[in-house]
Amino acid sequence: VKVPHLVYLLGSAPTARDVGRFGLAYFRDQGFRVSVFDVAEICHPRIKPSRDPNFSISGVELKVVSTLEELAELGGVLRTASVIMCFATEGLVKPENTKLLRLVAHSGRPYVLLRSEAHPAPLHEQGKIPLPTRLAQTIKRLRYVKPTHSVARRLPLKFNGLRPADYVILGGRRSLATSGLITGHTQPIYGHSQDYDQALKIGITPDQITNSAVFLDQYLPHHRDWQVLKSFPGFDADLYYRRVNRLFARIEKELGLKVIIAAHPRADYEKQNPFEGREIVFGRPAELVRACKLAITVSSLALNFAVIYDKPLMLISFAEHFSIPEMNPLFRAFSHELGVPYLFLENVETVDLSAYLKRDASLYQDYRANYLVDHQADGLSLWQRVHLGLSEHGLLPAPQSGQPNQDNIKHG
């Protein structure tokens, strides 16, 4: 009997976190052949990926594709796939990923996109911004417009040698959007968000509540967005950390909550703890939020855990960051949909912290259905749902019982 072969295309270097996040261990433990191709350099040539050279997953083939020659060789592998898990894009076509997407199209094999991680659409408030400011922002953005990207997005797929995705994995109600590779041809597979999936694994209800506040760190001064967003000149990291630490000190003194740092997975705090010695925890944001009384973040999508576990949320920012034209509409959208006003770090000494210990239950409920999960609780994991969907379409055998074993992961 031929063993089903799943070929994954990942737009960033795989990490231990991705083993569960992308279902690698799940499908391996179902007895399938799983091949993972890291195409980060192909899809993001301006960003140097951070890779652990010792990283491996028992029973899973891992390979880096960084040159056009290696990309050409990938075409032959794609033709052997039962299913291509094309997770190098959520559906957008760009000049950088066009060669890869052509290989997928020419393989003739069915391919799947992952769109389970929807978030609020940018909220523009043009009517409240003075005309001179709007004009200045538009001129600034035009300096960084890429005509080739605009053309790539608008060309018919066939003209570009591409074809629509066969399937798309969805999360909440608003995760489906017809654009780019997602057309009327694309069949939905109803799942839920990765964060909801993580909550299912550890327990979906709050437990062992502690007097803690959790800062969902984004490694903000060194975030990779600044490598891409050339319109943003950066900001003073020392000033940022001084301000957040003043906020944390007030929270600890006035609210009686110990602030714990849920570190960004790519953060490097080995040489220095910029949070004045506060506890830094890697890889456990869900567990920390589940047990806390307040979650704090700038705009980390890990704020989803606050919604899942029904925890009050504090959104923070500062003038240089909040005013970035490309980012500001997203910040406004989070604030609007969650009913949480941003706390500006410039005002950290005077803001009423107690106001952030409340949350709007109705808005949380809507956010949960729109962006996280829109199905009745049945205990099935995201990848069990995906497997069921693919088997119903005749692409994979029906699922076996049992849970994936993620112990066979090696990294330095």
Predicted regions, residues:
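Conserved catalytic-core segment of nucleotide-activated headgroup transferases in glycan assembly
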Residues: 197-270
